[in-house]
């Protein structure tokens, strides 16, 4: 089995058919499709069950209770048997040649991870979400130098093939977070996975469609959700620091990932203050200074590697 496609499912009945069609109709047929039911309340799983009846490559796992995207995805990865893992969110979809192109880019399993470009999909229109020039690295140190000086950092867990044995070897640490994450779960997973990858390939092909879903947790601007997102980032930042203290992580991207996590968390805290009507003059001044300093730091990092 070349690739295991992991699809966590929760209340996506409007989109799941397009997601599953894009997985089932891949030009590369040597794949398995693992659907993990996170106990939603709509007809998503009824639709998934119908597809499973007609395709033996589809395997369905049901959580005992709602666990959230992060732990649900981990449940699917536990059961995977493919050489590589491809994470696919159930409201997104793939180019029909995604698996074939990405697997060919592994060079017969030489690369631990292959990353490809993605589109942002909104109202049946595609725009670039992330894209890469072709770049390959034969050591973690070589990758670390390049990654640290990259202007735009991609930490999505989707849009990649990741060697299953590397992913599964780190599941215990990831699952030990024991928290129902709705935000920042990709940051933690990629922080750990990057540390354990030595050979990495970035390709220019645009193979993933990331859908704007107004009902998703990431687009929920309520006070309660903002508080949950802040809590999630704080948990993830603490977990990254814990992992770094126990492992010899590359200092450059360790610093980069954690500082970006803190920056994103600070943005959410400002949004919460604005929502609560507590964003005063000193907050505005602080936000302006922090924003300018963030831009300066990024320019120094990209241009001089510091």
Outline where the language-model segments fall:
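C-terminal subregions of glycosyltransferases and related glycan-biosynthesis enzymes
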Residues: 156, 202, 209-306
């Amino acid at each position: 089995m070349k690739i295991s496609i992991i699809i966590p499912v929760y209340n996506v009945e409007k989109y799941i058919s397009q997601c599953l069609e894009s997985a089932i109709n891949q030009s590369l047929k040597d794949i398995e499709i693992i659907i993990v039911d996170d106990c939603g309340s709509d007809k998503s799983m009824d639709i998934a069950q119908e597809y499973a009846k007609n395709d033996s490559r589809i395997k369905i796992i049901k959580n005992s209770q709602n666990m959230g995207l992060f732990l649900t995805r981990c449940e699917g990865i536990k059961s995977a048997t493919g050489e590589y893992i491809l994470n696919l969110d159930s409201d997104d979809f793939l180019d029909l040649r995604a698996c074939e192109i990405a697997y060919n880019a592994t060079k017969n399993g030489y690369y631990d991870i292959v990353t490809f470009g993605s589109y942002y999909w909104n109202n049946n229109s595609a725009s670039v979400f992330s894209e890469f020039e072709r770049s390959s690295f034969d050591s973690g140190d070589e990758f670390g130098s390049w990654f640290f000086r990259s202007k735009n950092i991609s930490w999505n867990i989707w849009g990649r093939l990741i060697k299953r044995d590397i992913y599964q070897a780190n599941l215990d640490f990831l699952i030990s977070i024991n928290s129902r994450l709705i935000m920042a779960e990709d940051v933690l997973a990629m922080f750990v996975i990057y540390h354990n990858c030595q050979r990495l390939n970035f390709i220019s092909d645009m193979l993933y469609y990331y859908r704007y879903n107004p009902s998703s947790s990431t687009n929920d601007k309520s006070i309660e959700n903002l508080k949950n997102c802040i809590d999630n980032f704080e948990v993830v930042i603490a977990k990254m620091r814990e992992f770094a203290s126990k492992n010899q992580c590359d200092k450059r991207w360790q610093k980069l990932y954690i500082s970006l996590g803190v920056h994103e968390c600070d943005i959410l805290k400002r949004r919460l203050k604005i929502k609560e009507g507590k964003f005063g003059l000193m907050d505005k001044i602080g936000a302006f200074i922090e924003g300018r300093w963030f831009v300066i730091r990024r320019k120094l990092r990209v241009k001089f590697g510091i």
